Design a protein with these regions (language model features):
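A short N-terminal helical cap/helix-turn-helix that marks the beginning
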Residues: 1-22
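Flexible, low-complexity linker/hinge segments
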Residues: 1-5, 137-179
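Conserved AMP-binding/adenylate-forming core of the ANL superfamily
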Residues: 2, 22-66, 70-74, 91-96, ...
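Hydrophobic alpha-helical segments in the ANL/AMP-binding
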Residues: 49, 67-86, 95-96, 207-210, ...
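Structural core segment of the AMP-binding/adenylate-forming
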Residues: 51, 78-157
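Conserved small/polar residues in nucleotide/adenosyl-binding loops
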Residues: 185, 215-222
């Protein structure tokens, strides 16, 4: 059992490092501070709340590594849902299988990957979102996702009339023994198999790396990290 709560580790990190750089897309000028990432997470949380997502609901993400991939991942876990990361080099059939087998409600995807998927084979999805700008690429009949996203700025102002600040970061309370991630590996036979990872698994990796990172950072303060 890891002493530090996985979700609270990130909640505290966003607060303490509010003005520092958090994510940068390689080869681009796009950069997010910890505070900006926390605000993007808050926007996605409002969407999840609007759609009545609950603890244990699954959200898949597939695409190249970028800031929005990380934001979708963090927004899912800090809301209390379960993230399902999918390798971007999986075939469309494998992606269809993983999304359906995991019973994912939402899918965040690169536009080019979505172009090669067949929405009629993803019967459980309520919404699909672009990792380029989080716009809605698909909503199931009867959903109001696209309409909500058009008014998201107003929803943010209504929820945070004084503006979003570090004091507004209050993520769900979830013990480390709960499943937070379904990891599908490339199967040697048939379709890929899913592995359930808990907060303890994830917190163990994070807490192990923190002392090593701090030691290196003190010696190399101007370095960037992948």
């Amino acid at each position: 059992m890891i002493k530090e709560n996985f979700i609270k580790l990130y909640e505290n990190s966003f607060r303490e490092n509010w003005d520092l750089p958090c994510y940068t897309d390689y080869g681009e000028n796009t950069q997010y501070t910890y505070g900006q990432v926390a605000e993007e997470i808050a926007r996605l949380h409002l969407l999840f709340k609007h759609c009545s997502l609950r603890r244990g609901d699954k959200i898949s993400v597939i695409g190249k590594n970028n800031a929005h991939w990380c934001i979708a991942y963090m927004a899912t876990i800090t809301y209390g849902a379960i993230i399902v990361p999918i390798l971007q080099d999986f075939s469309p059939n494998d992606v269809h299988h993983i999304v359906n087998h995991s019973e994912s409600t939402f899918l965040f995807t690169s536009d080019n990957i979505w172009d090669n998927l067949e929405e009629e084979k993803l019967t459980g999805l309520r919404g699909v979102f672009s990792l380029t700008d989080f716009r809605c690429l698909y909503q199931r009949d009867g959903e109001t996702i696209q309409k909500f996203l058009k008014n998201l700025d107003k929803e943010m102002h209504s929820s945070y009339p004084q503006g979003f600040s570090r004091e507004n970061i209050q993520y769900t309370t979830l013990s480390n023994d709960k499943v937070m991630l379904l990891n599908y590996t490339s199967g040697t036979t048939g379709f890929s198999k899913g592995v359930m990872l808990t907060g303890n698994n994830l917190a163990g990796n994070v807490t192990f790396g923190i002392p090593v990172s701090y030691t290196h950072l003190r010696a190399h303060e101007t370095d960037s990290y992948l």
